[in-house]
């Protein structure tokens, strides 16, 4: 959330910065201006009324010594003035509540280093790791490989849960567990503390990281009141862990990695990635989260990006890093890198991680701070990134590591987690006859 005082003091500056995101961001900010002006008017009026109250109290004390007959009339005037103060305070409270509601709908202004653009086509590739493998055959997409190997099952999953769900069988299920353990081991060796968070959280927690109130249609929630929400990413509970806390400066940065299932309604995704496991209602991910000093968050952002890329480098998976343009950034982010893994069966790079610096946007909502050099509390900066998406790593392994005979070579770092298994070959599982 934006700082109301800063917005009110220089509305035009925020308007210019948000205009880089597009007209929608400017429109979200527009209603704030007249309300901020009304807030100033009410604050001036309240200050005036409280001064009049203080003067009236002083006058009553003086009258009590010099003109007792006039005291009762003065007290009646003071009571009337008190009623006016209460009315002004109530009006101010309503305005401030509405301002808070409106500011919850305004996205984070982009960092100056973010390129301008309308959509993903304007993102800037900043580096590439590895080379595209040359195949002596036409590589297959992961959904064909998974079906031929018998390890990815969609028909039975649809019977259980509908579309955008997958059952992993045999070696694919083992591969998923291996990937999770490998990712966690790599990240903890690089200074992250492992967290296993709750998967159901409150509305306040969802609001803290920016999913609410704007993106409720993308979430799954319970029907009880108040509802609980299934997390769309471990970023939500882990970032909120330190809500309303103050850190000493020497404790920063705070670094966490967390494995969790993620649940997303995928509203607005009809017709996109309907085959395979690229876009699911339920998937697994290892998330990286940092709380940083404001002056160190840019450097921590680059380190987090490298940490996310490290697991792909160790697996030997060809990928590239793109800096997202202003029109393709997430709501809470000031700057985001996407890591895109090469999928030869699809002939495309596909996002496998987003690594974002939210600066103080989330921290203002959850009130997480640290003591600066003068000892005064200052808002922390929050950072998050996938380290990385597990299902999409399976996609990349199936497609990049496929062989002409239809088998898939398991990257060496994962083999110890799979009992030494070196490749995935076709498996047969019991199956009844549909009646």
Swiss-Prot record:
Catalytic activity: tRNA(Ser) + L-serine + ATP = L-seryl-tRNA(Ser) + AMP + diphosphate + H(+); tRNA(Sec) + L-serine + ATP = L-seryl-tRNA(Sec) + AMP + diphosphate + H(+)
One Pfam family named in its UniProt record: tRNA-synt_2b
Residues the entry annotates as binding ATP: 264-266, 351-354
PROSITE patterns, A to Z: AA_TRNA_LIGASE_II
GO biological process annotation, one example: selenocysteine biosynthetic process
Keyword Cytoplasm set for record: yes
GO CC annotations on file: cytoplasm
A GO molecular function held by the record: ATP binding
Keyword ATP-binding on entry: yes
Sequence positions that bind L-serine: 233-235, 287, 386
Keywords: Aminoacyl-tRNA synthetase, ATP-binding, Cytoplasm, Ligase, Nucleotide-binding, Protein biosynthesis
Pathway it works in: Aminoacyl-tRNA biosynthesis; selenocysteinyl-tRNA(Sec) biosynthesis; L-seryl-tRNA(Sec) from L-serine and tRNA(Sec): step 1/1
Known EC number: 6.1.1.11
Class of this enzyme: ligase
Subcellular location: Cytoplasm
Alphabetized InterPro entries for the sequence: aa-tRNA-synt_IIb, aa-tRNA-synth_II, aa-tRNA-synth_II/BPL/LPL, Ser-tRNA-ligase_type_1, Ser-tRNA-synth_1_N, SerRS_1_N_sf, SerRS_core, tRNA-bd_arm
Domain of life: Bacteria
Membership in a protein family: Belongs to the class-II aminoacyl-tRNA synthetase family. Type-1 seryl-tRNA synthetase subfamily.
Function: Catalyzes the attachment of serine to tRNA(Ser). Is also able to aminoacylate tRNA(Sec) with serine, to form the misacylated tRNA L-seryl-tRNA(Sec), which will be further converted into selenocysteinyl-tRNA(Sec).
Quaternary context: Homodimer. The tRNA molecule binds across the dimer.
Domain observations: Consists of two distinct domains, a catalytic core and a N-terminal extension that is involved in tRNA binding.
The name this protein goes by in its record: Serine--tRNA ligase
Organism encoding this protein: Anaeromyxobacter dehalogenans (strain 2CP-1 / ATCC BAA-258)
Gene: serS
């Amino acid at each position: 959330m934006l700082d109301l005082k800063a917005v009110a003091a220089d509305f035009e500056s925020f308007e210019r910065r948000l205009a880089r995101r597009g007209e929608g961001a400017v429109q979200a900010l527009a209603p704030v201006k007249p309300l901020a002006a009304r807030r100033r008017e009410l604050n001036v009026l309240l200050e005036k009324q409280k001064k009049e109250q203080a003067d009236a109290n002083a006058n009553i004390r003086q009258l009590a010594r010099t003109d007792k007959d006039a005291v009762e009339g003065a007290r009646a005037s003071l009571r009337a003035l008190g009623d006016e103060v209460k009315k002004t305070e109530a009006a101010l409270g309503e305005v401030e509540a509405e301002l808070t509601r409106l500011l919850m709908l305004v996205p984070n202004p982009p960092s100056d280093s973010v390129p301008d653009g309308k959509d993903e086509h304007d993102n800037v590739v900043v580096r590439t790791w590895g080379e595209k493998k040359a195949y002596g055959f036409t590589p297959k997409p992961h959904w064909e490989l998974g079906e031929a190997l018998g390890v990815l099952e969609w028909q039975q999953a649809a019977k259980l849960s509908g579309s955008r769900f997958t059952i992993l069988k045999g070696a694919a299920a083992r591969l998923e567990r291996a990937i999770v353990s490998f990712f966690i081991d790599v990240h903890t060796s690089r200074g992250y503390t492992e967290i296993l968070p709750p998967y159901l959280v409150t509305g306040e927690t969802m609001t803290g990281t920016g999913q609410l109130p704007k993106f409720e249609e993308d979430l799954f929630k319970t029907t009880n009141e108040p509802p609980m929400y299934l997390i769309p990413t471990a970023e939500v509970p882990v970032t909120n862990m330190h809500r309303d806390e103050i850190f000493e400066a020497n404790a920063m940065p705070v670094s966490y990695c967390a494995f969790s299932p993620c649940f997303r309604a995928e509203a607005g995704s009809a017709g996109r990635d309907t085959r395979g496991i690229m876009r699911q209602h339920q998937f697994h991910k290892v998330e990286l989260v940092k709380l940083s000093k404001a002056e160190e968050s840019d450097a921590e952002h680059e380190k987090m990006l490298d940490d996310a890329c490290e697991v792909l480098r160790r697996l030997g998976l060809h990928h590239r890093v793109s800096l997202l343009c202003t029109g393709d950034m997430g709501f809470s982010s000031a700057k985001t890198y996407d890591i895109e893994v090469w999928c030869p069966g699809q002939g495309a790079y596909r996002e496998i991680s987003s690594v974002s610096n939210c600066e103080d946007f989330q921290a203002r909502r959850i009130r997480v701070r640290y003591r600066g050099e003068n000892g005064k509390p200052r808002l922390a900066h929050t950072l998050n990134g996938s380290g990385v998406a597990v299902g999409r790593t399976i996609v990349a392994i199936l497609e990049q590591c496929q062989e002409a005979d239809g088998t898939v070579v398991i990257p060496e770092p994962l083999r110890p987690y799979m009992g030494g298994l070196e490749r995935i070959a076709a498996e047969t599982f019991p199956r009844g006859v549909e009646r």
